[in-house]
């Protein structure tokens, strides 16, 4: 580990020279990447210096215990050694964690897609509930959200809804929400009081900037049509709805919420760009993971990740076996306990992988 950290210290010196270069600012993408690396390496070296300082203090304390004849001073040195060893253990764990390079995607804004699955109207109603849950959470975090596409049912549910959330560390917080969310409750439309089980699929995509993914216009088929409302009726007399098909991948995006065709096209392109970016990132992630399957962050959208049981006021996350009896608060956007637990579990998995890597180096 020390050899790797010493090499990274040399790299920091190189990066500092790059930062001092006045021409760096001319290349915005390179500037951002360099500043991100500088920030990461500076933080890493600060912890490494702390680690080396504690290591030296431990050596000094051991030497003092060995050579000191005064019993009282010897006991004081032993006590100090005990606290230093605990601090050393923590610093070593922090270093291992820091040695896992930060995922640049974590700082990104997101596009979230929620689709009603099995359960018909009840699934669509729960999709609307999840949308409200996430937007309440966004408001608590002072994030902004914008609906990009919506397909509403006559009962006020959503067959599907696509929206963006922008703010600080959005993808890092919500990336583990991708998957199947199962709900168990008595539907409002159910007269007999029987509990029904429905499912909703959530996809969380890091929002791609225009410079990050190139889309050739000849790869797109753009159709315009009249916007439809609940039950299929036309709600617009002009051809403002836009459907974009990306021919190479077969991805289709429809936006019809704006009265302007130009605005709908711009929104559809945002969604398409992020879906294509997500496809690329998923391939890279699969290559990196290869033999290591992450329980927390697999992002498999067909995986059942959470159950919301309304009669018992219970929410269970199946990936980390966490159950909370505060579903009412969760549905109002109190997601921190769930999200923090998922992030900690993912970090622990990464630390185990880092330990394995260091052991077999």
UniProtKB/Swiss-Prot annotation:
Methylated by PrmC. Methylation increases the termination efficiency of RF1. The modification N5-methylglutamine is found at residue 233. The keyword Transferase does not apply. It is found in: Cytoplasm. One of its GO terms (molecular function) is translation release factor activity, codon specific. Belongs to the prokaryotic/mitochondrial release factor family. PANTHER family: LD18447P. This is Peptide chain release factor 1.
